[in-house]
Amino acid sequence: MLDPNLLRNEPDAVAEKLARRGFKLDVDKLRALEERRKVLQVNTENLQAERNSRSKSIGQAKARGEDIEPLRREVNKLGEELDAAKAELEALLAEIRDIALTIPNLPADEVPVGKDENDNVEVSRWGTPREFDFEIRDHVTLGEMHSGLDFAAAVKLTGSRFVVMRGQIARMHRALSQFMLDLHTEQHGYSENYVPYLVNHDTLYGTGQLPKFAGDLFHTRPLEEEADSSNYALIPTAEVPLTNLVRDEIIDEDQLPIKMTAHTPCFRSEAGSYGRDTRGLIRMHQFDKVEMVQIVRPEDSMAALEEMTGHAEKVLQLLGLPYRKIILCTGDMGFGACKTYDLEVWVPAQNTYREISSCSNIWDFQARRMQARCRSKSDKKTRLVHTLNGSGLAVGRTLVAVMENYQQADGRIEVPEVLRPYMNGLEYIG
């Protein structure tokens, strides 16, 4: 959520920055609501002061032996007016907050302006796509050859966009997640976490999934039902529970950065993706991901974004997978991001690069929703932290890339060297 003071005092400047990412801020409506808020605020404060003054007069009149009943009736009437004014003010503040919750983050100045993914800017490439001297098989064909990917069984169990993995393919999928976790915890300084896969609505508001993206989630009960202890949603990413671990916390600045990682399944309805990537593992309702989250001082967040992106890149480099790094344009960034790098891995059967990691600096956008703050050791003042998140990596898409890039002419799949210790020294699948 954006700083309310910024929205009140500099709405035109905010609107100009939001326009860069294709969001139209209704400045006139905000101004009208703000003027109404000021009027109601003053009215409420005046009624409160008047009621306090008249209440005090009751005691004084009583001490003088005067009839206090007229004063008591007046105080009661003022109390009713005050309650009505407070209710009106609270309703208006709720309306303003509801609007604020739908406004995306401001883009950083260095983010390229653009409309969609076609305007993203390539930053660098690593590795050279392999030239095959045989007909390339896609991961679905390879998986079926080795009885490792069974989409028909998943349709029977659940429906489309799910998969059953078996045998050495399932083992490689597990090996990838273990390798990623070990790399991030042993070399990159992250602490491993095991988190719930079901979270409450407060948690989803904290990281920005609610209210705007309710339709992208799997809910245990209809969202319109009153929230209670049994009203949950499945996590779309481990970013949600990991980041919310600091909700309503005040952290000493010398404890920062906090670097966390977790391997979880992720659940997404893919509501806007009908007809896209219907074959294979690229776009699933349920997929595994190793997530990275950092909680940092505000002045450190841009450097932390570069570091985190480098950690995701290291996974691809050690696996020997060609990839490219791009910076997302303003129109393609996620709702809460101020700056995002995507890593796209080479997928031979599609003859193109596909997203495998997204690393974002969220600034104080989530921290303000969560009231996550840090305290200076010198003056004890508190301020909002900055939060960052990144995929390190999406496990299913990494499996796709390994299967296709390491395939052999006879259909076998070479196991990358860094994965062999996790697969009992196995060199080839098949």
UniProtKB/Swiss-Prot annotation:
Q: A GO CC term? A: cytoplasm
Q: Name one Pfam family in it.
A: Seryl_tRNA_N
Which reactions are catalysed by this chain?
tRNA(Ser) + L-serine + ATP = L-seryl-tRNA(Ser) + AMP + diphosphate + H(+); tRNA(Sec) + L-serine + ATP = L-seryl-tRNA(Sec) + AMP + diphosphate + H(+)
| Cell location | Cytoplasm
Biochemical pathway: Aminoacyl-tRNA biosynthesis; selenocysteinyl-tRNA(Sec) biosynthesis; L-seryl-tRNA(Sec) from L-serine and tRNA(Sec): step 1/1
Group of enzyme by EC: ligase
For the biological process aspect of GO, one term held by this record is:
seryl-tRNA aminoacylation
Residue sites binding ATP per the record: R268, S269, E270, E355, I356, S357, S358
In the record, what terms sit under GO molecular function?
A: ATP binding; serine-tRNA ligase activity
Query: EC number(s) of the enzyme?
Result: 6.1.1.11
Q: Which CDD domains match?
A: SerRS_core
Q: What domain comment accompanies this record?
A: Consists of two distinct domains, a catalytic core and a N-terminal extension that is involved in tRNA binding.
What the protein does?
Catalyzes the attachment of serine to tRNA(Ser). Is also able to aminoacylate tRNA(Sec) with serine, to form the misacylated tRNA L-seryl-tRNA(Sec), which will be further converted into selenocysteinyl-tRNA(Sec).
Q: What is this protein called?
A: Serine--tRNA ligase
Q: From which organism does this entry originate?
A: Salmonella arizonae (strain ATCC BAA-731 / CDC346-86 / RSK2980)
